[in-house]
């Protein structure tokens, strides 16, 4: 294994060979069919899977890759995962003849050093051939697995020193040959996974991939393979053209930003991500040179494909949203992802937690850099929690269960120009659904005691960030809890004069003499009845808070998003009356005087 693999996998692919010509109408129909197939296969997977992370939280996606390994179609999903899928399949394509690809085959890959994301994100894919036996496209599914067979249950280890501590890396593996399940291979996978639900999850992934390949075959039969190939070529070229047209509207120049992670999982502080975005005509270059390369860092190594995917997930949020998402995006952007750094680590580095951080800091840095030229489209599509509180236990039969902690919450939804931070999480998480309390409690021995928004936790701004939430959970049986805390020192940054989001905090064994705050990372044995209180940070603000409409601040106080004190100190709004009596009013004259004084004092 070497960096050469990444260089080879990311090399630009040529168009598919075809004698057909298509217009925008035909290519649009086929593109729509691709999106429908991806959506249907993802729904198929979600409904058939056994584990809550897939069938409730929707951490699954469908994508279509063409015969050259280019991203040809996606549907609603988790964008970062969708943009990762092509590289793992390109690795499989390099062994097309050796692995005897044919109709009815299904493959699996998850190896971070061979095009994958982190180990828990399995990519299962099935090829589609035309009547002449020539490969046309590949249906791919991505889904998060609750365990990967590593040294610690759950796949997230806060002290892993290499990828093998985390579990079983799979560069490529044939699961089904010509429609027949390979029982020996599936037994190997199931034996290397602690979760009994994995048996159902891998079966669901195989079934969904086969279903997608069958739908693709029907499409190819209806339109003929040459037309489908021509449509894929057309759509990729059109996406590149439209993306470049957007970039051409931006002023030329180099726009830079630095973002930091508080620390790695063992305490090495201020882990840096640097991004320089250079615009030259219709060419955008995203250069991550300058990102941290300290060899002693632990668990903050993001895989190459993840770095590429997270960068693109942020970029597409800053251009016309009607641009079709496919390989044309990557053709339009040059990415410099330096080898030997946290954004493209040396082989065999642990990758599970790096898919959170520095992955999210890449997107945040791009957003901050480009907010200098496209502020109206700048909102970081990231999450700043180190990791959810993963709670793990074993039943009387010794079978493992795991509450992933992907709970309903509000956090990290920053404001953008004209709009306050909204909803639960940023829109960049796509169709990820956060778990409801009732569902988690029906599956696991936990009680969700409260989930409530926290006053003054949204970053102030002309448009304020979404408040964060305090989630309190009790475990009813002795359990293992794994946590990694960041964004206490370096929360989400405000944009264009907006203030930063509030910090995160996390306490275990709350209300007992043993209560403690998680300052870094922990793998704790919790007794039955232990309570965990996780304060999620809010979103960051956009624009000066002294420009926020005082009437909006008044409404925020009435809604308990903002306190009377913060209204005065952070927004410069003087209120009269009582929040308890709901008769608060803005003192217009006093507000104007206070804002004038505060703006002079704070520059």
Functional labels for PLM-detected ranges:
Residues 2-103, 108-131, 135-285, 289-603:
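Glycine/proline-enriched, intrinsically flexible loops and inter-domain linkers
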């Amino acid at each position: 294994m070497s960096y050469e693999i990444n260089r080879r996998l990311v090399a630009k692919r040529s168009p598919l060979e075809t004698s057909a010509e298509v217009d925008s109408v035909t290519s649009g129909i086929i593109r729509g069919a691709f999106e429908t197939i991806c959506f249907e296969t993802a729904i198929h997977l979600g409904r058939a899977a056994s584990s809550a992370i897939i069938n409730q939280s929707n951490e699954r996606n469908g994508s279509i890759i063409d015969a050259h390994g280019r991203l040809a179609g996606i549907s609603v999903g988790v964008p970062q995962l969708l943009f990762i899928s092509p590289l793992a399949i390109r690795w499989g394509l390099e062994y097309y003849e050796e692995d005897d690809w044919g109709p009815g085959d299904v493959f699996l890959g998850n190896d971070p050093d061979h095009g994958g994301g982190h180990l828990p994100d399995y990519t299962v894919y099935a090829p589609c051939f035309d009547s002449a036996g020539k490969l046309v496209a590949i249906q791919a599914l991505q889904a998060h697995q609750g365990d990967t067979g590593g040294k610690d249950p759950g796949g997230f280890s806060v002290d892993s020193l290499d990828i093998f501590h985390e579990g079983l890396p799979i560069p490529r593996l044939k699961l089904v040959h010509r429609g027949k399940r390979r029982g020996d291979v599936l037994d190997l996978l199931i034996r290397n996974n602690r979760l009994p639900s994995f048996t159902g999850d891998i079966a669901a992934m195989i079934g969904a991939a086969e279903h997608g390949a069958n739908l693709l075959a029907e499409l190819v039969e209806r339109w003929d393979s040459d037309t489908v190939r021509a449509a894929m070529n057309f759509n990729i070229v059109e996406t590149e053209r439209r993306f470049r047209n957007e970039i051409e509207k931006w002023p030329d120049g180099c726009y830079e930003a630095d973002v930091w992670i508080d620390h790695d999982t063992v305490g090495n502080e201020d882990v840096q991500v640097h991004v320089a975005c250079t615009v030259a005509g219709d060419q955008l270059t995203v250069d991550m040179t300058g990102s941290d390369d300290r060899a002693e860092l632990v668990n903050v190594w993001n895989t190459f494909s993840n770095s590429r995917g997270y960068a693109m997930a942020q970029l597409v949020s800053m251009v016309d949203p009607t641009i079709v998402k496919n390989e044309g995006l990557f053709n339009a952007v040059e990415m410099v992802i330096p080898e030997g750094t946290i954004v493209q680590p040396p082989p065999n580095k642990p990758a599970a937690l790096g898919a959170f951080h520095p992955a999210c800091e890449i997107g945040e840095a791009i957003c901050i850099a480009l907010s200098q030229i496209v502020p109206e489209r700048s909102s970081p599509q990231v999450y700043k929690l180190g990791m959810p509180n993963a709670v793990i236990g074993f039943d009387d039969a010794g079978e493992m269960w795991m509450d992933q902690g992907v709970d309903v919450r509000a956090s990290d939804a920053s404001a953008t120009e004209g709009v306050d931070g909204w909803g639960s999480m940023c829109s960049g998480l796509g169709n990820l659904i956060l778990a409801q309390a009732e569902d988690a409690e029906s599956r696991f021995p936990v009680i969700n005691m409260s989930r409530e928004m926290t006053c003054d936790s949204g970053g102030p701004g002309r448009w304020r960030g979404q408040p964060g939430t305090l989630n309190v959970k009790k475990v009813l049986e002795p359990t293992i809890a794994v946590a990694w805390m960041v964004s206490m020192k370096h929360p989400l940054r405000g944009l264009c004069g907006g203030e930063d989001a509030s910090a995160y905090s996390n306490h275990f064994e709350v209300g007992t003499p043993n209560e403690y705050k998680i300052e870094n990372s922990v793998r704790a044995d919790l007794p039955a009845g232990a309570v965990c209180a996780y304060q999620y940070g809010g979103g960051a603000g956009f624009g000066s808070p002294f420009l926020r409409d005082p009437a909006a601040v008044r409404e925020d106080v009435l809604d308990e998003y903002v306190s009377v004190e913060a209204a005065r100190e952070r927004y410069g709004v003087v209120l009269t009356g009582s929040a308890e009596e709901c008769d608060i009013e803005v003192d217009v004259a006093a507000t104007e005087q206070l804002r004038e004084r505060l703006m002079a004092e704070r520059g």
